[in-house]
Structures are given as structure tokens and as C-alpha cells.
């Protein structure tokens, strides 16, 4: 059983008989001497989808459950359901729009590296790759004398995502975006 300080985002924890997927972790280090570092974790219940929040000391022991990860490709949308197809056995997995709302900003037809997280054959969540490539569909025109300095401008993508990009980029260019931080990484190869 791992300590609370060893738990990472995306892991499944068994807490009070409920399977909870770790959505976010905040670390608080109190300034008082002898005070333990606190780990405030936000969970989502695997079965019900309800949100839950709990704080742990760094040396608290937590029970984790092994996840099965399956490589998938985005297939189609059916009402509020997003359908993904397994890359190996072509079985289909459905996820509700509410469950993957954060990931929808990066979900395009050509996205590669998607995984579904499963426990006991039940789909829990969708995991995005660390970076995705997307095409800029709307941004202000590049300035003639724009240098590769730190000046930025907003750029909009087909999914509705808007991030800051260097001002030398133009509409139609493909860029790499860090999915967790929603930030520009560089031009796509």
C-alpha cells in the first residue's frame, strides 16, 4: 500500500469501500515546525461520478487498485455519448460528455495516443497524450518585424480551445500543445 505522498493523478484509490479516481492533488506544506505536509486530493467516484475531496498526511497509507489501460481511437459522437474504438480488438467504449468535458478541448478526429482507463471491465476515464498537434484556425496576422521574443497573442483551434502563442505564428500552422497545462510547446514537425 502506497503512502499519500506517492499517489499520482489518474490513479484509482479504494477509500471506505468506494473506488475513487484521483483528479487533482494539492500539496500544502505548513510553516510550523513538526507539522506534516498535507495532500489535498480531489476524487471522482468511479461508479457514480460524484466529486469528493479529502486531505491526507504524507505518511497516511492508501489502498490503490490496478487500472487496465487500452489504446483507443476517437470514433464518433452519439448524442451525449462519445464512442471510442479499441485499437486491438475493435470493441467500442462509451463515455458521457460530462465525464470527459476537460478533454473535449483536445479531441479531434486525427488525435493519436488516447487511452481509456478501466477497472473490472468498466470504463472509468479517458487519458490524453501529453502533447497533441492542432491547427490554428484563428489568430491575428503575424507582424512583419515580429521576433521570436516572448510576446504572445491568442490563437483559437477547431475544438474551441484558445491559448497564447508566439506572435510570429499564422493562421493554418500546426502547433504542439501540452494537454495538462494547456500551453504552446512549439511548431509541429
Curated annotation (Swiss-Prot):
Its Gene Ontology molecular function terms?
translation elongation factor activity
Check the record and name the PROSITE patterns matching this protein.
EFP
A Pfam family assignment: EFP
Q: Which SMART domains match?
A: EFP, Elong-fact-P_C
GO BP annotations listed = peptide biosynthetic process
| UniProt GO cellular component terms | cytoplasm
SUPFAM superfamilies reported in the protein's UniProt record? Nucleic acid-binding proteins, Translation proteins SH3-like domain
The entry sums up its family as follows: Belongs to the elongation factor P family.
Q: State the species of origin.
A: Hahella chejuensis (strain KCTC 2396)
Name it: Elongation factor P-like protein
Q: Which Gene3D superfamilies match?
A: 2.30.30.30, Nucleic acid-binding proteins
Amino acid at each position: 500500500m502506497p503512502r499519500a505522498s506517492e499517489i499520482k493523478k489518474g490513479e484509482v484509490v479504494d477509500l471506505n469501500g468506494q473506488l475513487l479516481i484521483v483528479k487533482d492533488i494539492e500539496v500544502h506544506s505548513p510553516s510550523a515546525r513538526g507539522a506534516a505536509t498535507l495532500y489535498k486530493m480531489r476524487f471522482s467516484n468511479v461508479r457514480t461520478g460524484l466529486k469528493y475531496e479529502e486531505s491526507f498526511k504524507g505518511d497516511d497509507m492508501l489502498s490503490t487498485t490496478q487500472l487496465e489501460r487500452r489504446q483507443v481511437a476517437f470514433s464518433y459522437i452519439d448524442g451525449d455519448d462519445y464512442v471510442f474504438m479499441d485499437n486491438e480488438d475493435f470493441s467500442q467504449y462509451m463515455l458521457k460528455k460530462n465525464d470527459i468535458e476537460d478533454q473535449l478541448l483536445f479531441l479531434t478526429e486525427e488525435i493519436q495516443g488516447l487511452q481509456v482507463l478501466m477497472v473490472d471491465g468498466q470504463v472509468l476515464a479517458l487519458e490524453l497524450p501529453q502533447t497533441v498537434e492542432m491547427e490554428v484556425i484563428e489568430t491575428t496576422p503575424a507582424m512583419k518585424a515580429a521576433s521570436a521574443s516572448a510576446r504572445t497573442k491568442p490563437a483559437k483551434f477547431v475544438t474551441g480551445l484558445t491559448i497564447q502563442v508566439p506572435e510570429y505564428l499564422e493562421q493554418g500552422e500546426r502547433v504542439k500543445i501540452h494537454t495538462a497545462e494547456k500551453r504552446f510547446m512549439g511548431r509541429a514537425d
